[in-house]
Swiss-Prot record:
PTM note: Methylated by PrmB.
The species this protein was found in: Francisella tularensis subsp. tularensis (strain SCHU S4 / Schu 4)
Described purpose of this protein according to its UniProt entry: One of the primary rRNA binding proteins, it binds directly near the 3'-end of the 23S rRNA, where it nucleates assembly of the 50S subunit.
Protein's name in the database: Large ribosomal subunit protein uL3
Keyword vocabulary terms for this entry: Methylation, Ribonucleoprotein, Ribosomal protein, RNA-binding, rRNA-binding
Xref: SUPFAM superfamilies: Translation proteins
Length: 211
């Protein structure tokens, strides 16, 4: 993973091009990402930088974390995130990054935690087809049906698509276009939708793929 930014999902809107074309965009608020630690191969076994963003009351920060922030001379943030980099020596503890890291037209990958839906059935979770509404079917309209064979193998295979917990998992959307960068207000406008609820933390990194 290359260096990226941690932001917060604000919601969706749309903007218009000069030709009057409507583009749906997701607004991501990017507060300054401050470097709290630089990890190197010699000391930690790999190159990475650790960043924080946002604000947290000092009364809500425990002593070990307070000491970690104080060592970096950085105000406590709402969390810590890490980005692996090729050359950690290029970064300094206490330095910061903002939305100007990206530019309009650039492709980015966006990671977030999808909305949790709780325990859901196979129809909603895996797009299973429903069974007959009538014609002798009185109870099994939305059940998933058979889950395997008979005595051989006599068990249900792992990862069988069945009812279960839906959502609340890490999701990455690749190659989204940065439509606009509002450096003054610290906003990124990304084309299309991104995972997570409004107010959720989002990680934006340069796209891995070139298409």
């Amino acid at each position: 993973m290359s260096l990226g930014l941690v932001g917060r999902k604000c919601g969706m809107t749309r903007i218009f091009t000069e030709d009057g074309v409507s583009i749906p965009v997701t607004v991501v608020q990017v507060e300054p990402n401050k470097v709290t630690q630089v990890k190197t191969v010699e000391k930690d076994g790999y190159n990475a930088i650790q960043v924080t963003t946002g604000f947290k009351k000092r009364s809500n920060v425990n002593k070990p974390m307070a000491g970690h922030y104080a060592k970096a001379s950085v105000e406590p943030g709402r969390g810590l995130w890490e980005f692996t980099v090729d050359a950690a020596a290029e970064y300094q503890v206490g330095s910061s990054f903002d939305a100007t890291m990206f530019e309009a037209g650039q492709k980015v990958d966006v990671r977030g935690v999808s909305k949790g839906k709780g325990f859901q059935g196979g129809v909603k979770r895996h797009n299973f087809a429903t069974q007959d509404a009538t014609h002798g079917n009185s109870l099994s309209h939305r059940v998933h049906g058979s889950t395997g064979q008979n005595q051989t193998p006599g068990r249900v295979f792992k990862n069988k698509k069945m009812a279960g917990h839906l959502g609340n998992e890490n999701v990455t959307i690749q190659s989204l276009e940065v439509v606009r960068v509002d450096a003054e207000n610290g906003l990124l406008l990304l084309k299309g939708g991104i995972p997570g609820s409004v107010g959720g933390d989002i990680i934006v990194t340069p796209a891995v793929k070139s298409w």
